[in-house]
């Protein structure tokens, strides 16, 4: 009976989904929106970079660069070029040590471009220091020195001269406070002028004595200041007969430029000076001077006397060598040698032109 029955299709309800249609997933609205969204310029550039096979992956904020082709180092041309560079390396400027400077550093020798300054021994003064503060004592001491000068047989008696005074950045230089002189390397005289209203006549006569040759570095300005502070002193006669050691050094040694006492001491005496700023800028008008001030003042005139004697010796040697050279070789050869920069501080017997 059942085989004669026909199966009738069963009508589905309106809310039911057929099995075939249920297997197919509908695209979600979110995906649909992404598909229809317009790409930004950055995204378009990323897509272009991603589609290029010869460029690396795009990094944030930097454009992509094409991959460099690797050189084949096995080619004959490249091999020959590398061999030539190994034999004759190219010259390069570098801040690193070169072979020569490196070997010099290992040996401990200084570089020729920048040699280390020579270390000179400091001056040690072991002579007497005679220090006076009162007007009558200064007058008596100056009179003793004056009598000693008159007893000398030499026509010229060199005397180192220097001055000290206080200085303030608010008020400027103070009145001349100290005069120091040296006529013999074994004794220096220091006269403090704080209690002196007028320079003693014996001291004025001493510095103006016709046999006395006052010398120092920048000494002319010292005389001008002394004349401003003490009207009984006239600067011009002292300036006319004094010797500036820096200018004299330029004449004898044929050097140039301006000299300080410290540099002149290094060059002529081969000694170093302890020019302490604390002592140099100290209160020179305060009585009494301490040991550091006394030694500072004494060394200034002591080394001045030493420099004078050495320049005097060199000048005599130079004059003698020049005269002997002229006698043997003539004036033409002498002028030629001077043009070449010869100073004649050392003896030259013969020259071939």
Swiss-Prot record:
EC number(s) from the headed UniProt entry: 3.1.11.-
One cellular component (GO) term of this entry: nucleus
Domain of life of the organism encoding this protein: Eukaryota
Disruption of the gene: reported phenotype: Females are sterile. Hypersensitive to the topoisomerase I inhibitor camptothecin. Highly elevated rates of mitotic DNA recombination resulting from excessive reciprocal exchange.
Cellular compartment(s): Nucleus
Keyword line: Exonuclease, Hydrolase, Magnesium, Metal-binding, Nuclease, Nucleus, Phosphoprotein
Chain residues that bind Mg(2+) 1: 162, 164, 300
Keyword Magnesium: yes
InterPro entries cross-referenced by the UniProt entry: 3'-5'_exonuclease_dom, 3-5_Exonuclease_domain, RNaseH-like_sf, RNaseH_sf
Biased composition (Basic and acidic residues): 13-30, 37-50, 71-90
One Gene Ontology molecular-function label: 3'-5' exonuclease activity
Primary location group: nucleus
Positions bound to Mg(2+) 2: 162
Segment forming the signal sequence: none
Keyword Hydrolase: yes
Stored Pfam families: DNA_pol_A_exo1
Family: Belongs to the WRNexo family.
Described purpose of this protein according to its UniProt entry: Has exonuclease activity on both single-stranded and duplex templates bearing overhangs, but not blunt ended duplex DNA, and cleaves in a 3'-5' direction. Essential for the formation of DNA replication focal centers. Has an important role in maintaining genome stability.
Protein name: 3'-5' exonuclease
Organism of provenance: Drosophila melanogaster (Fruit fly)
């Amino acid at each position: 009976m059942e085989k004669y029955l026909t199966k009738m299709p069963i009508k589905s309800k309106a809310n039911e989904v057929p099995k075939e249609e249920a297997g197919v997933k509908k695209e979600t609205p979110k995906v649909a929106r992404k598909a229809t969204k317009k790409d930004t310029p950055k995204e378009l550039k990323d897509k272009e970079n991603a589609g290029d096979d010869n460029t690396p992956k795009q990094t944030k904020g930097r454009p992509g660069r094409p991959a460099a082709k690797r050189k084949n180092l096995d080619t004959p041309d490249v091999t020959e070029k590398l061999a030539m560079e190994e034999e004759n390396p190219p010259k390069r400027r570098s801040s690193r040590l070169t072979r020569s400077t490196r070997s010099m550093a290992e040996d401990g020798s200084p570089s020729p471009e920048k040699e280390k300054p020579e270390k000179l021994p400091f001056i040690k003064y072991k002579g007497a220091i005679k220090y006076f503060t009162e007007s009558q004592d200064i007058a008596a001491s100056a009179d003793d020195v004056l009598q000693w000068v008159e007893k000398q047989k030499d026509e010229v008696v060199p005397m180192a001269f220097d001055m000290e005074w206080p200085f303030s950045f608010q008020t400027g230089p103070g009145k001349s406070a100290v005069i120091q002189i040296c006529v013999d390397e074994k004794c220096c005289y220091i006269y403090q002028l704080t209690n002196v209203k007028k320079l003693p006549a014996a001291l004025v006569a001493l510095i103006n004595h016709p046999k006395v040759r006052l010398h120092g570095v920048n000494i002319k300005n010292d005389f001008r200041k002394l004349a401003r502070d003490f009207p009984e002193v006239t600067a011009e006669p002292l300036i006319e007969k004094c010797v500036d050691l820096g200018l004299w050094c330029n004449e004898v040694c044929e050097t140039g430029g301006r000299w300080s006492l410290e540099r002149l001491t290094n060059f002529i005496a081969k000694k170093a000076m302890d020019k302490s700023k604390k002592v140099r800028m100290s209160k020179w008008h305060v009585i009494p001077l301490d040991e550091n001030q006394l030694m500072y003042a004494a060394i200034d005139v002591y080394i001045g006397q030493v420099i004078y004697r050495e320049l005097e010796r060199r000048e005599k040697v130079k004059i003698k060598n020049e005269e002997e050279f002229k006698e043997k070789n003539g004036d033409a050869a002498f002028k030629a040698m001077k043009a070449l920069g010869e100073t004649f501080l050392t003896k030259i017997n013969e020259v071939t032109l």
